[in-house]
Amino acid sequence: GAKSFAGPFTQTRKMGLMKAQIVSQGRVSLVLPDRLRWELFPPDEIVYFVTPDGLAYRNRSSQGAVRANDARTLAAGLDDLRAMLGGDLAQLRKRYDLKAFAVGDDVELEANALPSAEGRGMKAIKFGIGKDRIRPTFTRLVEKNGDSSDIRFGELRMNVPIDPASMHL
């Protein structure tokens, strides 16, 4: 099974009533079971780290940590993304109604927030897995306020060594 993966992505974020679009390039690294590094390249230039301790970030001018109980929406959303990318669907079942569909050679997973999950995490997550049944191909995150992020993964390298020091501040 997969123990880690790393590779590029393109993220298109739609925000606000006018649905302004921001397109970013980045790199994702995941070390199972519980470490995610989400890096957006310039001009965004920020790195998010999701670990069991919570959410941390670093950009050109600052860095900080947010404990798991603070900043719930962002931390929970990134934690849900980590769970989806890492295949920890049991964790998601607590807050989402999960469905899976075959689409050609790929599989798509859809997670819609349960009413009991209001105020925590995402409204919906859609996620694609390639024909190898391991490698993610895309994800769509819809926030409770209607903002969304569409992420297309490039060639993800599986089970590559990832420096543990790169997975936290």
Predicted regions and their residues:
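An acidic-aromatic
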Residues: R27-D79, S149-D150, E155
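Short beta-strands and strand-coil junctions in structured, solvent-facing domains, enriched
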Residues: G16-L17, L36-R37, D44-V47, S116-G119, ...
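Flexible, processing/modification-adjacent segments and terminal tails
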Residues: K3-K14, M18-Q21, R58-R120
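Short, surface-exposed coil-to-beta transition loops
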Residues: V23-Q25, P43-D44, T51, R120-A124, ...
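Short, solvent-exposed loop/hinge segments that bridge or flank secondary-structure elements
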Residues: M18-L30
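Gly/Pro-enriched, hydrophobic low-complexity segments
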Residues: L89-L169
